[in-house]
From Swiss-Prot:
Biological classification of the source: Eukaryota, Fungi, Dikarya, Ascomycota, Pezizomycotina
Pathway: Secondary metabolite biosynthesis
InterPro entries: Questin_oxidase-like
EC number of the protein: 1.-.-.-
The name this protein goes by in its record: Questin oxidase
Length: 445
């Protein structure tokens, strides 16, 4: 049985699995590699946007049916850039049980080993559902900040925490909580709380059925938002922090506040959210250029799988589930603006002709072997999960809110594989689809 410090995977875990069985030795290999990562590696290998993806890569490769060799490849592709986890400060870790000390140490990457020890002990004592409830969903000042921090850093705390829950690994849950606690800020928290307040105090009544897709179009149509982030800001973090939330927070908040979720519509709105995220990833292209997947829109899809995992937990209340969907969608809108709010063209998905013609099953087999740091495997698995949960809503009432339907899910997955497999990491993705210079090395079509 897994503990707060020991990895012990069981068969048949995972939301979107390629198979119920893995080759002999796969679970043992995954246990060993994940334990090594947990014991030896920091959660951050650099000070900005340097997230440790080793657990993501190993677990997603396992879920796609990977064997021991595939899992070792998944580990090795991410391990060489990792840095050792520093020694923890015993007094600092002990002090985190005091809310003032917890608050004072939040937002500092150097505090990761202390938060990891703290959450490990908490989970050992009470189990991870109780700890996640207290530190993310209880409504205290600390929990409210932790809830918002799940969406920091391109959703990485949410992705990591949800992987721990999905595969029932308390130690990975502890890693995810520690990551959320110490993550540096892009000002996501004030945006989310400000937008929440705005949604509840606007003079005009909010339509709980406002399609999320219409809000992406509203972002595209807003000249202030289209100009707020620019390539000179540097990386995606700066385009969010200094661009969209620094120069156009009021404009993005007014649009984002219009997305609301009724507790009776959780499944529908969650499916709508992941359909729109997949639409961003597949349709944010450049006319005249070969198809590529925007790195930031990719994360909107992979984080959706993490959200699905949380929505399946009976210990998360319907009200908190509605809030998770609202906040995830609102942050998706921010990242769309930060990538330049490129025109979204459905035909770029529908007209795409895959080079390899892979089915889902053959795609899983191919992705397991691709040298990658986990992004491709996460993306493919999240798309398959999206296809499954969206299918009941793609026809009939409000079907127009679901831009991705039927074979389009597989088409986007094929596009991702075709455009990234065998390429160095900097050439696998587009790092902001709305900025023309980023397409300079992409072949013309």
């Amino acid at each position: 049985m897994a503990t707060a410090s020991q990895i012990r995977l069981r068969p048949r875990l995972g939301v979107a699995r390629a198979t119920d069985t893995n080759p002999d030795g796969a679970l043992e290999a995954a246990n060993r590699l994940l334990q090594k990562n947990h014991n030896e590696h920091h959660m951050f290998w650099r000070s900005v946007a340097g997230h440790n993806h080793v657990a993501h890569s190993v677990l997603n490769t396992l879920a796609l049916g990977g064997g021991p060799g595939d899992l070792q490849r998944a580990f090795d592709d991410g391990a060489e850039i990792q840095v050792p986890i520093p020694p923890m400060d015993r007094d600092a870790a002990a002090s985190l049980s005091t809310p003032d000390q917890f608050r004072a140490r939040m937002g500092s990457l150097e505090q990761y080993p202390n938060f990891l020890v703290f959450f490990t002990k908490e989970i050992e004592t009470r189990g991870y559902p109780a700890v996640v409830i207290e530190y993310c969903f209880s409504g205290t000042s600390i929990a409210e900040s932790m809830f918002a921090n799940l969406f920091e850093g391109l959703y990485h705390p949410l992705i990591h925490l949800a992987l721990g829950i999905e595969f029932d690994q308390p130690s990975i849950v502890a890693e995810g909580l520690a990551q959320a606690a110490c993550h540096d800020s892009m000002n996501i928290e004030p945006f989310l709380f400000g937008t929440d307040k705005l949604a509840k105090t606007q003079d005009a009544p909010i339509d709980l059925n406002t399609p999320l897709l219409s809000l992406f179009h509203a972002v595209r149509d807003n000249e202030v938002l289209r100009a707020a982030a620019h390539r000179d800001h540097g990386d995606g973090v700066a385009r969010v922090r200094d661009g969209i939330l620094g120069r156009a927070r009021e404009e993005i908040s007014l649009i984002a506040a219009r997305f609301r979720v009724d507790v009776d519509e959780l499944d529908h709105r969650a499916a709508e959210m992941i359909s729109c995220a997949a639409y961003l990833a597949g349709s944010a292209q450049r006319p005249g250029k070969a198809r590529k997947i925007d790195f930031f829109h990719l994360h909107a899809v992979t984080a959706s799988l993490g959200l699905i995992v949380l929505l399946q937990q009976p210990w998360v209340t319907p009200e908190q589930k509605a809030r998770l969907i609202e906040w995830k969608a609102r942050v998706d809108l921010v990242w769309y603006a930060a990538s330049g709010a490129v025109e979204l063209r459905r035909k770029d998905i529908v007209d795409y002709r895959p080079r390899h013609g892979l089915t889902w099953d053959s795609l899983y087999q191919a992705v397991r072997r691709v040298h990658d740091d986990g992004h491709l495997a996460k993306f493919i698995r999240a798309l398959k999960a999206g296809e499954q949960i969206s299918r009941p809503f793609e026809q009939g009432k409000r079907a127009e809110a679901f831009p991705i339907k039927g074979s389009m899910w597989l088409r986007i997955a094929q596009m991702a594989y075709d455009s990234s497999a065998g390429r160095p990491i900097e050439e696998k993705w587009i790092w902001g689809a709305g900025f023309e210079p980023n397409w300079a090395t992409v072949p013309a079509v």
